[in-house]
């Protein structure tokens, strides 16, 4: 099953997450099919969250499931989208 979830990057104490479409059997930071966006929780300036909505809807259309955290981030991005 394909799942859209976070893959951790960055250094110690400075997390950075890629939002990726991957097979659910792969490791958290292992091989992925496509990078759909990113989330930077420690960003002070610039953008902390970017999601390619067209690719996200494509993957959901072919049956990919969102992890609970990615669901929350997608709602957050959609809420911020009309304000921008």
Swiss-Prot record:
Organism expressing this protein natively: Burkholderia mallei (strain ATCC 23344)
Family the UniProt entry places it in: Belongs to the bacterial ribosomal protein bS16 family.
Domain of life: Bacteria
Record gene name: rpsP
Entry's Gene Ontology molecular function annotations: structural constituent of ribosome
GO CC term, one of those recorded: small ribosomal subunit
Pfam families given in the database record: Ribosomal_S16 (PF00886)
Listed NCBIfam families: S16
InterPro entries recorded: Ribosomal_bS16, Ribosomal_bS16_dom_sf
Keywords: Ribonucleoprotein, Ribosomal protein
Name this polypeptide is given: Small ribosomal subunit protein bS16
Record-level GO BP terms: translation
Cysteines joined through disulfide linkages: none
